[in-house]
Design a protein with these regions (language model features):
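Glycine-rich adenosine-cofactor-binding loop
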Residues: 5-15, 20, 127-147
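Rossmann-fold NAD(P)-binding glycine/threonine-rich loop
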Residues: 84-97, 214-260
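Rossmann-like adenosine-cofactor binding region
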Residues: 49-53, 64-77, 167-241
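Residues at the starts of beta-strands that form the adenosine-phosphate
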Residues: 3, 26, 42, 130, ...
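Glycine/serine-rich phosphate-binding loop and adjoining beta1-alpha1 elements at the start
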Residues: 45-128, 234-235, 254, 261
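Residues in the short beta-alpha loop(s) of Rossmann-like NAD(P)-binding domains
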Residues: 10, 33, 85, 159-161, ...
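A short, well-structured beta->alpha microelement
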Residues: 26-40, 70, 177-179
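NAD(P)-binding Rossmann-fold cofactor-contacting core
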Residues: 23-34, 150-170
Length: 263
């Protein structure tokens, strides 16, 4: 039986651990991880994201700081490290945050969480409203689909010609991401891209009452939006906050699939 040690204890990882036990793995979630935990494991499952500062593990439920360098030094070369948006160079490491199936499935609770925020933070129905989705990646596409199903008039921005064709074929209005300031005459904006696409001065002509940032790095200045009367919400990591059960199930299936081909 392969042993998986889970570092970090948010509800996503706790759910994933329980499901992985049901799959037949031995799973441990140490309250205070130490070098012995790293050395005795076949697999280390790290949190989402693995780090926020590039030096320590992003595990707020663990009281002491866990340094990535200590994990790398203490983990045997035979141990498989499953990380998210971080790679341990020179180690046997797989970034599950880059797994296509995981990212696509994870886009569903992200989209639902974003819609829940929009319903909560606006005084009007989504039906009949004008929604701008910045970015045509996995999250952008799933979100646009759900918004259209609720009766929104949806505009999706993209950069590539193929994406414009896809957007049009799906029945959405199109916008060039590089010219996004021309399309801010809307009711709600959802940003999914990790670069700044809306300049501070652009908010002066923006009619939206709400802008939600789903990206991890941010695509706009929230303070500038607020100064112009727009409610701005930074909302990275929504699956773990709004649907931890589903997010944990998705993670567990992803881990199982990875281990099936790598152990």
């Amino acid at each position: 039986m392969k042993k998986i040690t889970v570092l970090g204890g948010d509800s996503r990882l706790t759910t994933a651990a329980e499901i992985l036990r049901g799959y037949g793995y031995e799973v441990d979630i140490p309250a205070a991880p130490c070098e012995d935990d790293y050395r005795s494991s076949d697999v280390l499952l790290l949190p989402i994201p693995t780090t926020r500062d590039g030096e320590t593990l992003a595990a707020p439920n663990i009281k002491k700081k866990i340094y990535l360098a200590d994990i790398a030094r203490s983990t045997p070369d035979s141990t498989l490290i499953l990380s998210c948006n971080y790679m341990f160079e020179g180690k046997r490491c797989i970034d599950y945050g880059k797994n296509d199936a995981y990212c696509l499935l994870n886009a569903v609770p992200t989209a639902e969480g974003a819609i829940a925020l929009a319903i909560e933070k606006t005084p009007f129905t989504l039906w009949g409203s004008r929604a701008l989705v910045i970015g045509c990646g996995r999250v952008g596409r799933i979100l646009a689909d759900r918004l259209k199903a609720l009766g929104c008039r949806v505009t999706v921005s993209a950069r590539k010609l193929a994406d414009f064709a896809l957007i049009s074929a799906a029945g959405y209005y199109t916008a060039k991401t590089a010219e996004i300031k021309k399309h801010l005459n809307c009711d709600i904006i959802f940003n999914t891209v990790d670069v700044k696409v809306i300049e501070d001065d652009d908010f002066k002509k923006c009619t939206a009452s709400l802008i939600v940032d789903l990206s991890s790095k941010g695509g706009f200045n929230a303070a500038a939006a607020e100064e112009n009367g727009i409610t701005a919400i930074k909302a990275p990591g929504l699956p773990g906050k709004t649907a931890p059960q589903t997010a944990g199930e998705i993670l567990a299936r992803t881990v199982r699939d990875i281990l099936t081909t790598n152990l």
